Amino acid sequence: MVRDEDLDNLIKNLPFLIRQNINQHPSKQKLIEIVIDLGRRPEARFTTGPEYLSQKVISWQDINHFTKRISKFSNDNRAGIERTLHRISCIRNRQFLINGLTCRIGRAIFGTISSVRDLLESQQSILLLGKPGVGKTTIIREIARVLSDEMEKRVVIVDTSNEIAGDSDIPHSAIGRARRMQVATTDLQHQIMIEAVENHMPQVIVIDEIGTELEALAARTIAEKGVQLVGTTHGNCLENLIKNPPLSDLIGGIQSVTLSDDEAKRRGTQKSIIERKAYPAFQIAIEINTENSWTIHEDIKSSIDLLLRKSFTGTQVRELFLDKRTFIKYKKLQIDTFTLLKDSNSLKIQTINRSNNWFTRSQKSLFYFQNSKAKKCFIFIYSLPSNLISEILNKLKFQYVLTKELQKSSLIVGSKVSLNQNFKLKKLAQQCSIPVYSVNKENIYQIISLVKLFK
């Protein structure tokens, strides 16, 4: 990874005592932000922890010295330094006078997205989730550069606070060939998003910090027009978006549905349930846990549906090491049994993620996979002729072992009617995280199509 920090352009504008101490500090390159509050000692926050920069407290003169050397603060109390990525935010008193400053270091880090480059090449819309300060803006800046320079796409950035491309009319070189549209006030971000699509023919729209209902609706409108979206929002995981009413439209929105008595009994749930309302604006979600560890949801639609049914989703965790190796770890997949009790046509979509089934995980790949100890598939057959299934599996040269112990099985195969009636089997399958496959009839053609799904 290559870093471009422009730290000197920020430090030279600070008061003398702060400037001197930072320049002499051994952890200068690990600086995250500088906090300047009236009547308090200046504080520097590093990746290793906070430290005071001076024994002297900050005065009005120190604050005025700094604010005169930066750009004017906008309506969201943010400012910057010309041709840099640093952000300065202010705190005001009741008379609207500045009595506190937060100087956040902006860094262009090249090579941060090498572990998810395959997701960018899929041309699907990507949503990045993370806590404040985890590095979402740095990542989205690098995504814009890779899409515009290396993949040669028409990229337009909607830069609300001038954080992505810097505080200048000339965009920072870190965004490559991507174009940047500035926003006069934060209230107009959703209008600029629509304007970018209508006026500038982009293939990709990059948006930082989607935070209001209007912006979420604008994102959905852009997605319906066939433009690839790359956006960020605050939140630890997808569940936070479900519980956040203004942002739930990003993942399709949620609604309360009342089921009939028969349907509720078939599903084994209560009559009033929560379901996804529409298609999500984004197809892929990336949860940024730490700087080098990200959780990937390759199909947001399926993940949201399973979360609403209180089931675990099949996700992957990607870790990037210093030697540029990517380690991919698949989490265990646990799905409610009723979602699997579909006919064999819809089963291909409803059940297991293609990259999470046991067969794929047992193959050799460019990456490292966990949960791949079993080289043979242990099949538990319920209310179907085992001789017929064995014959089909042998003809298809499928490595398998028929087992009568449910807890040792890799998957369960049975008839739809019998599985619907056996609630105990459903519960055990859910507790043991065992996927369930079903067929409507004991038909050789249905069983063959079902077995082909295992591959």
Curated annotation (Swiss-Prot):
Residues that coordinate or bind ATP: 130-137
GO cellular component, one term: chloroplast
Gene3D superfamilies given in the database record: P-loop containing nucleotide triphosphate hydrolases
Keyword Ion transport: no
Keywords attached to this entry: ATP-binding, Chloroplast, Nucleotide-binding, Plastid
Broad class of where this protein is predominantly found: plastid
GO molecular function: ATP binding; ATP hydrolysis activity
Cell compartments where the protein resides: Plastid, Chloroplast
UniProt cross-references to PANTHER family, sorted A to Z: KINASE-RELATED (PTHR20953), P-LOOP CONTAINING NUCLEOSIDE TRIPHOSPHATE HYDROLASES SUPERFAMILY PROTEIN (PTHR20953:SF3)
Family: Belongs to the ycf45 family.
Protein name (record): Uncharacterized protein ycf45
Biological classification of the source: Eukaryota, Sar, Stramenopiles, Ochrophyta, Bacillariophyta
Gene from which the chain derives: ycf45
